[in-house]
From Swiss-Prot:
Involved in the planar cell polarity pathway that controls convergent extension during gastrulation and neural tube closure. Convergent extension is a complex morphogenetic process during which cells elongate, move mediolaterally, and intercalate between neighboring cells, leading to convergence toward the mediolateral axis and extension along the anteroposterior axis. Necessary for nuclear localization of REST. May serve as nuclear receptor. Residues 669-680, 815-831 have a biased composition (Basic residues). It comes from Homo sapiens. This is Prickle-like protein 1. A lipid is attached at C828 (S-farnesyl cysteine). Residues 14-122 form the PET domain. It is found in: Nucleus membrane; Cytoplasm, Cytosol.
């Protein structure tokens, strides 16, 4: 009996265990999980939770439990169902809420059912993912969706937010299952501020969301923003004032708030106003809007040059090139002769060209442009129009004499050392012999006749020619070389160098017209390589300013001009002139030796009669050139140009003031004795040589038109032309001593009629000019005016200011003397 009862007892015990609610694994499941699906056996519960992500399984005191609570509040907002959870509903709105909640529950609310599919079910498909659900697996069914519709446990999610439906609670709408939140939003808008359903008739819609009218306000000051401007920050609205005070960025340039009304530029966490003033180069202040820029150390620059802190535009202040101190490294590099082609060209253009058109500033594109900017443009124009082929000049190897190492080392003055050490070494070349001179005269005369038509073709107007280089400015900044870093002389220094040239300048007058064009800056790009004229003064002045040798690619080319040049170029257009209003002749051919050698070759036996010096009015400077400039060299250095000439220095009492010279005593001497005189008197030769011969009206120069002169050249042999040159009366033997200024003057014949008639003369330096064309002062004293009944100033008759380029070279001799303060210019105003 006991043996028979054992299986029955065990079966009863098993049945009781299965039917007991406390022992049916449900007790264990309730203790392990915060929530379990109702009506499931323990193994079915295990199968269900096994289908869910581990972090979403609601174990007790687990992240899954916290996630469940969060989802309950989110998916089933209590204020969507209960009036007590709402903040400020009117009575009407409360009734609407109750009706709304009851209707949703009645029409859409449901709970999903977990079922274990029988193995006979072969065609169950998940409604969400569309995959097959095999027999023996658990599936979720929704009664509102229909009996045959099922989902994988992990696919039973809200159609809108794609989150697992917490506790399997769903709302069915239009064939889709939703959580309680998104189902309510399908029916009524939800306020983004209070998260409640909006039952009022009016609401504010912004940013794709809805607000109660009174809830759409600034998050900071709670100002109602309905119908006003606002700014959204992290999904919250702000009024413009609060946003600027809390979140507005500061401009890196001006330091002010970037207002909501202003566009801004942002780069690497930095902000700028999107204006030309703020978003600009930190160095040159050029606007960078729409342009590439170079960021460096929190600043933005337009180019590499500006990022290095250098000013591309030279300063226009007085003597800026000499007042700016150089670093030791730059001095060392200068002494090593480092130089670039573009830098040398830029510096030379600065030395050669004055300020543009002081009488007609309207011709300039921008009247506020600095002088150095325009000078750089001119140098770029030379470079852009192929002034001279590099191979052409490199092929012309010139002999250079070795420098004397002791000459420059004996002086402590830095500028003097640079002048002596890096001066043009070709200056000491011997004078060309007579055969070379005659051959070159014939060659140049033929060449000038051939090139006359070419010059006419290339003769553009002043505005189009002089300013055509502006287009190259932005592209050529990096090509300026040393000149971009401030080592080139400023315009004030250029004026001073022109005054140094002036000291040795002859003041003979050329009655040509084309000489204006040949000597002007505009002609540089038109000249052929064989016509290109370079003065060794360029090298001397470059050495004074930069200390850089210009012997390499910028070697001076000797070029000989005969009188045919001056006579041939008579009737050309005088449109192109610069504004240098003084006799700015070069030092090149002004020594007594070169004049003597020239005169001995052209007219070997003729001795000039002694005549009284002529008294010529001088061109006067403009107001812009009236500031006195001074280059200080060592007072103890005087280079007499390798000639055994006795140099006398004036006493100390006479060095600080300008002196008055009388030329009558010098007019009574033969020019063969002038070699003994000082540097000052040597520059006076040009004045005296022109005046030592008196001409009758019948002996004056016959003027040829271009057509007549070409016929004359064709009909004459070389010797007849040479004889004609020697008999050219106005210039005589000393054509090469004439000034660089050809004067086109309707009153020239009146002047020639009075040639050499005055007895008294006086000379005054014109380094500082008058304040106007009518009266002038120097050092507080009025400059005496020429008698108006005799002749008029030439500048009154000029169509435009005269040019200021050096004369063509004759040999390579020049004088590198350092001028004393008392021996400034020798431009003479003679009454």
């Amino acid at each position: 009996m006991p043996l028979e009862m054992e299986p029955k007892m065990s079966k009863l015990a098993f049945g009781c265990q299965r039917s007991s609610t406390s022992d049916d694994d449900s007790g264990c499941a309730l203790e392990e999980y915060a929530w379990v699906p109702p009506g499931l056996r323990p193994e079915q519960i295990q199968l269900y939770f096994a289908c869910l992500p581990e972090e979403k399984v609601p174990y007790v005191n687990s992240p899954g439990e916290k996630h469940r609570i969060k989802q309950l509040l989110y998916q089933l907002p209590p204020h969507d169902n209960e009036v007590r959870y709402c903040q400020s509903l009117s009575e009407e709105e409360k009734k609407e809420l109750q009706v709304f909640s009851a209707q949703r529950k009645k029409e859409a609310l449901g709970r999903g059912t977990i079922k274990l599919l029988s193995r006979a079910v072969m065609h169950a498909v998940c409604e969400q993912c569309g995959l097959k659900i095999n027999g023996g697996e658990v599936a979720v069914f929704a009664s509102r969706a229909g009996p045959g519709v099922c989902w994988h446990p992990s696919c039973f999610v809200c159609f809108t937010c794609n989150e697992l439906l917490v506790d399997l609670i769903y709302f069915y709408q239009d064939g889709k299952i939703h959580c309680g939140r998104h189902h309510a939003e399908l029916l009524k808008p939800r306020c983004s501020a209070c998260d409640e359903i909006i039952f009022a008739d009016e609401c504010t819609e912004a940013e794709g969301r809805h607000w109660h009218m009174k809830h759409f306000c600034c998050l900071e000051c709670e100002t109602v923003l309905g119908g006003q401007r606002y700014i959204m920050k992290d999904g919250r609205p702000f009024c413009c004032g609060c946003f600027e005070s809390l979140y507005a960025e500061y401009c890196e340039t001006c330091g002010e708030h970037i207002g909501v009304d202003h566009a801004q530029m942002t780069y690497d966490g930095q902000h700028w106003h999107a204006t030309e003033a703020c978003f600009s180069c930190a160095q040159c202040k050029a606007s960078l809007l729409g342009c590439p820029f170079l960021p460096k150390q929190g600043q933005i620059y337009c180019s590499k040059t500006c990022s290095l802190g250098e000013d591309v535009h030279a300063s226009d202040s007085s003597d800026s090139a000499f007042q700016s101190a150089r670093s030791r490294d730059s001095r060392r590099s200068v002494r090593m002769g480092k130089s670039s082609r573009s830098a040398d060209q830029c510096r030379q253009s600065l030395l050669l060209s004055p300020a543009l058109n002081y009488k007609f500033p309207g011709l300039s594109g921008n009247a506020d442009d600095t002088l150095s900017r325009k000078l750089d443009d001119l140098s770029l124009s030379r470079q852009g129009t192929s002034f001279a082929s590099e191979e052409f000049w490199k092929g012309r190897v010139e002999q250079e004499t070795p420098e004397d190492p002791e000459e420059w080392a004996d002086h402590e003055d830095y500028m003097t050392q640079l002048l002596l050490k890096f001066g043009d070494k070709s200056l000491f070349q011997p004078q060309p012999n007579e055969m070379d001179i005659r051959a070159s005269e014939h060659w140049i005369s033929d060449n000038m006749v051939k090139s006359k038509t070419e010059l006419k073709q290339n003769n553009q107007s002043l505005a189009s020619k002089k300013y055509q280089s502006d287009m190259y400015w932005a592209q050529s900044q990096d090509g300026l070389g040393d000149s971009a870093y401030g080592s080139h002389p400023g315009p004030a220094s250029s004026r001073r160098l022109q005054e140094l040239e002036l000291d040795h300048g002859a003041s003979g007058y050329n009655h040509d017209e084309t000489q204006w064009y040949e000597d002007s800056l505009e002609c540089l790009s038109d000249l052929k390589p064989e016509q290109s004229v370079r003065d060794s003064m360029d090298s001397l002045a470059l050495s004074n300013i930069t200390g850089a040798s210009v012997d390499g690619e910028n070697k001076p080319r000797p070029s000989l001009y005969s009188l045919q040049n001056f006579e041939e170029m008579e009737t050309e257009d005088c449109e192109k002139m610069s504004n240098m209003g003084t006799l700015n002749s070069s030092m090149l051919h002004r020594s007594a030796e070169s004049l003597k050698s020239l005169s001995s070759e052209l007219c070997p036996e003729k001795i000039l009669p002694e005549e009284k010096p002529v008294h010529l009015p001088v061109l006067r400077r403009s107001k812009s050139q009236s500031r006195p400039q001074q280059v200080k060299f060592s007072d103890d250095v005087i280079d007499n140009g390798n000639y055994d000439i006795e140099i006398r220095q004036p006493p100390m009492s006479e060095r600080t003031r300008r002196r008055v010279y009388n030329f009558e005593e010098r007019g009574s001497r033969s020019h063969h004795h002038r070699r003994r005189r000082s540097r000052k008197s040597r520059s006076d030769n040009a004045l005296n040589l022109v005046t030592e011969r008196k001409y009758s009206p019948k002996d004056r120069l016959r003027l040829y038109t271009p057509d007549n002169y070409e016929k004359f050249i064709q009909n004459k042999s070389a010797r007849e032309i040479q004889a004609y040159i020697q008999n050219a009366d106005l210039y005589g033997q000393y054509a090469h001593a004439t000034s660089d200024y050809g004067l086109q003057n309707p009153g020239m014949n009146r002047f020639l009629g009075l040639y050499g008639e005055d007895d008294d003369s006086w000379c005054s330096s014109s380094s500082s000019s008058s304040d106007s064309e009518e009266e002038g002062y120097f050092l507080g004293q009025p400059i005496p005016q020429p008698r108006p009944q005799r002749f008029a100033y030439y500048t009154d008759d000029l169509s435009s200011p005269p040019s200021a380029l050096p004369t063509p070279q004759f040999g390579q001799r020049t004088t590198k003397s350092k001028k004393k303060k008392g021996h400034k210019g020798k431009n003479c105003i003679i009454s």
